[in-house]
């Protein structure tokens, strides 16, 4: 799969043009007892990893089975390659690294389906939305949002995306900012813009959370939202970004 070929593929372009149609039901009957698939997204250093862990601990403590998943999953062979790139140890072509990020999500798809079908709620630290936003923000010819989305067609669609919003000033004040490849102010601004576009396309399942407060304040906000999602009615699992 090449960037040029997919960028000109009209079916992918159509798939990326209307988020209201991005989620389609899997060919399985509704499972009222399935777990919820909740994704936390946001710019770097917005506190996603900390909040994901706190949410999993909270759900389990209240008798609702929950597990944490992170993308990239740096424990796999593919994840090890991604980690080397992010830590600036190796250089990888922009198209290739995007495909590796996507492959890292694909290799966990069956595990995610299994856990959800068993009634476990998954709290996911980054997902396909980050993959699209970070690559699209690079502005590389042939790697527009439609191409980026095409690589993840068929992955599980989350019940909700909770986006942790943080100002550039607050982001840079947080510890360790700048250690990884993408942690540059100008680039993070472009990532924000890319996320804004995804937010508009994923209306109804995307909630913006102010991450500028204390850790406990943000957690209380997230906890209420997650309670509503987990307790709410869930239809059959869907897939990204199909018509």
For each feature predicted by the language model, list its residue ranges.
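NTP-dependent small-molecule kinase module
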Residues: 2-31, 54-56, 169-243
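Hydrophobic anchor at the beta1->P-loop junction of P-loop NTPases
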Residues: 40
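Walker A (P-loop) phosphate-binding loop of P-loop NTPases
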Residues: 45
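Conserved lysine of the Walker
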Residues: 48
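Hydrophobic positions on the alpha1 helix immediately C-terminal to the Walker A/P-loop
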Residues: 51
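ATP-dependent small-molecule kinase phosphotransfer cores
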Residues: 62-153
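Short glycine-/polar-rich loops that comprise or flank the Walker A/P-loop
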Residues: 64, 156-160, 202-205
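A glycine- and Lys/Arg-enriched "phosphate-lid" helix/loop adjacent to the NTP-binding pocket
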Residues: 126-194
């Amino acid at each position: 799969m090449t960037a040029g070929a997919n960028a000109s593929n009209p079916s992918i372009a159509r798939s990326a043009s209307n988020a209201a149609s991005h989620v389609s039901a899997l060919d399985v009957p509704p499972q009222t007892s399935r777990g919820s698939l909740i994704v936390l997204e946001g710019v770097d250093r917005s506190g996603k990893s900390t909040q994901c862990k706190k949410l999993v601990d909270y759900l389990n403590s209240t008798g609702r089975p929950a597990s944490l998943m992170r993308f990239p999953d740096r424990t796999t062979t593919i994840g090890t390659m991604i980690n080397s790139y992010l830590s600036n140890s190796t250089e990888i072509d922009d198209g290739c690294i995007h495909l590796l990020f996507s492959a890292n999500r694909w290799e966990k798809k069956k595990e995610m389906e299994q856990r959800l079908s068993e009634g476990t709620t998954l709290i996911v630290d980054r997902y396909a939305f980050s993959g699209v936003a970070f690559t699209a923000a690079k502005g590389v010819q042939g790697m527009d949002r439609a191409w980026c989305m095409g690589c993840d067609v068929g992955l599980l669609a989350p019940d909700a995306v909770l986006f942790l919003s943080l100002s550039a000033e607050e982001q840079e004040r947080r510890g360790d900012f700048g250690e990884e490849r993408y942690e540059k102010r100008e680039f993070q601004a472009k990532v924000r813009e890319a996320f804004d576009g995804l937010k508009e396309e994923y209306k109804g399942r995307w909630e913006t959370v102010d991450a500028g407060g204390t850790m406990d304040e943000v957690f209380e906000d997230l906890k209420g939202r997650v309670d509503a999602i987990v307790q709410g009615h869930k239809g059959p699992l869907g897939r990204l970004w199909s018509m």
